[in-house]
C-alpha cells in the first residue's frame, strides 16, 4: 500500500473481507500500543499496593524503608518508572530486599514480599509494546466476523501484515475462529490509526450508534442495547468528536473544494448537539440530506479533525453506493487528491464509472505510480473461497468483469425476439 489501493470485484468476491481484516489488524496494533503503557502502570500500581499492604507498618518502623519507599503507592510508581536505567532500578530493589531480609518477619510473609518485589521487577522490565495483542485481535475478529472468520473448510487461517522495512510484521493464526497465536516482530511504527467507512448513511444514525455497544463489550444478559461491529462505532465516535477548529487538515479540505462540491458543509449544532448540514446560513437535519452529500461530509469531518492523515489509513467500502455517476467522478478526484497529499487509502469498488474516474484523475494528478489495482474473484478450484490478484498493468480484466452483468442486458432487440418466439 504505497498510496491508494483499489480492490475491485463483483458482489460476494471477498473485497470487504480484505478491508475488514486489514482494519482488525491495524486497529489491534493501535489499541494494544495505546493501552500497553497505561496497562503497565496500572499493573505496577496494583503490585505496589499489594507490597505495601504486605509490609504494613514496617514501612514506618524501619528508618531505612521509610527513607527509601515513598508514602503513597502512586509516588512509588512514579519513582520506579522514572528509573530508566536498568542497573539503577535493580540496585534500588535489591536494597529493599536486603533490608526486608534482616527484619523479623515470618518466613511466609518474607517469601511473599520477595515474590511481590520480583513481580514488580518483571513488570518494569517488560519491554514488549504488544504483549496483549492476541486478546485484542480475538475481540476485534469476534466483533467484525461474529465467530465466522476461518476460511470455509479449513481449520486454521493465517494473517501477516508486512511493513515497508521488510523486517517488521504482525502475524497471527486463527484456529476454529479463535486467535491461536499472535506475534509482532521488528520495531517500526506501523500506523497511528485506521478508519473504516462502510456507509455515509450512518451519519443520520450517530446518536443511536453511540448509544450502542461494541460486540466485545456486550453483556449477553442485557438486551436493551444494540450490538455493533467495532468499525461502525469507531467511525461514529470519530465523526461525533470532529471539531470546527481550523487546522492544517481543514485547509486540505478547503483546497479540495469539498464545500463547493456539496454547496455547504457539515457542523455540529451547539444548541441541539446534533449534526447539521449548513447551506446559505440555513441548517438542515442530516436525514434530509442526499446520500452523496453525506459522503463528502464524511471526508470533510475526517479531515477537519485530523482523523485521516499521512499515517492514518482511510478504508472506504464501495464509496460509489447511493451516488450519482457524476458525483462518483467528483469523489474519485478527491480520493486522488488525498493520495497526492500523502494519505494512505484503501478502496473497494464494483463500479466501472468510479474505477475509470480513479484511473483518469491518477493520470491527471501524476500519481499513477502510487495507485495499485487488485481484482477479487472466486477461486477456480474452490467456489467457497476467493483470490485477490494485482491487475495494475492489466486493468481491462477488471472492466471486463464489472461490465459482464450489463453486457447480458444490452441487446434489447435480442430480448424482443426471444419474447416473440
List each language-model region with its residue ranges.
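Phosphate-coordinating catalytic segments in nucleotide- and nucleic-acid-processing enzymes
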Residues: 28-311, 386-421
